[in-house]
Amino acid sequence: MVVIYLNSTGNTYWIPIYSLNDKIREPYIFYVFAIFQTSIYILTGYILVRICWIFLTIKVFHDNMNIMMCWFLCQWFQAFLAKIVLIPYQFGIIKISMDINKTYYDWWSDTVEKSAILREDVNIWPIYFASYFLWHYMYSILFAVLAVGLERVCATWYIQDYEHVSRRHIPILLIAATNLITLPYAYQTTNNRTPLLQTCLQSIFIGSVAVFGYIMLWRVNLAWRNRIVNLKFTHNEKYSLARKFQIEENIKSLILARKLVVSASVFILVVTILLAVLLFDPHGYDAFFVHALDNSMLLPALVMSLTLLSCSPAWKERFISGLPIIRRLKSSSVAHQNSYSTASSAGKETEAYFEQLRSSWA
């Protein structure tokens, strides 16, 4: 992420792009990156819309959990619009720095010398608001894991009647609380008031709390399921189908969470490798690694949605059957079967007619 410095006020801003005034638009490689980036964005948008619709129509989990998953996944479109605003600055189509011929590749800097110094006549607001909303998206994805985990805590707490009572206030309050945390975080980060080390430590802490919470929920729900299987209840507990169903749903959601953690860990490992390679200054290939790292910011939603899709056979089947190419193949196959059955029935009717004709002449 490039840090830019405003001369007139002395303020610094942390912009969530890995390059500024990039000259990659001059050679043909720019068109390769542009086509690849556009294809990824179109594919991600299509998959997210389809998956959110599937979540709301095929209710594998409770409505509250489905609503929260759709909300956090659809925030990708917020990040997409912010990224569209930032791209002209990134590729030097709109120049804002004092040295318009210099290309800035940086992760973070706490010195003015390594920052991009802005011209006095620059309108900072478009790049500022776009950066703010992109930071907000990244923090929202981080806190989404914690928020969905808290929804499962509520499901465990109200285990006797959670399936029968909607309790729409739970996802509303959790989404509102998440934004009350992420909006100030995004403001502090955009204004470069949060050091890089502090940002990393906070992210690690939040992830650790979420993982610990999921482990505890897993153990509690497994213990309850074992009690139901063994019919061992305490004096203030009672068996009910709603309780059994909710325990099974909690366990399914925790298995889903485990798959999300594994896929997110692999994704973070790949991004870390890209960052490590970039820090070693690969001469001649720096543009490739910079843009690979830059595009990785909008990929978590795609990784999460594909992982969620693979967790339910019903979701996966609906998604695959709804693909345009699959629909065409199915429609042509149905038409072929209908024509074949029509021809077959017509042939049988003809044979029956001639058989009756022969018998009448016999």
Curated annotation (Swiss-Prot):
Pfam families noted in UniProt: Sre (PF03125)
InterPro entries named among the record's database cross-references: 7TM_GPCR_serpentine_rcpt_Sre
Gene Ontology, cellular component aspect: membrane
The entry's keywords: Membrane, Transmembrane, Transmembrane helix
Membrane topology listed for this record: Multi-pass membrane protein
Subcellular location as annotated: Membrane
Transmembrane domains' residue ranges: 29-49, 67-87, 127-147, 170-190, 204-224, 260-280, 288-308
A GO biological-process term: sensory perception of chemical stimulus
Nucleus recorded as keyword: no
UniProt similarity note: Belongs to the nematode receptor-like protein sre family.
Protein name in the entry: Serpentine receptor class epsilon-37
Organism from which the protein derives: Caenorhabditis elegans
Phylogenetic classification of the source organism: Eukaryota, Metazoa, Ecdysozoa, Nematoda, Chromadorea
